[in-house]
């Protein structure tokens, strides 16, 4: 959906350059800390892109590095059904499908501070993958 990117930028989202991970990480952390200092909540898709197959893939470290540097907790949210509503390469929403949202318990500031970023990403991924599996069983 090529119109989503420009719409998100107008909304105040943080665009990243996919070809330069180091620059992207610095931008996420700097801009993210600025928004957090203004009282905003930030939503980050930790895979770095939307899943084209509806499965959970490896998490990148940006969200976790930001939480660690900003000293804030992480509230994991699992989404199921996005690939049915926002089909890849389509310009239209498919409103006839269900999007399930499951909010998980927050990850404490203390746990974030004492856990290495890559380990934290793996832990949160495991918790979210298990929750996604449970949502799909219902």
Predicted regions and their residues:
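Catalytic core of membrane glycerolipid acyltransferases/transacylases, capturing the structured
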Residues: 1-22
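Non-catalytic C-terminal accessory region of glycerolipid acyltransferases
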Residues: 26-138
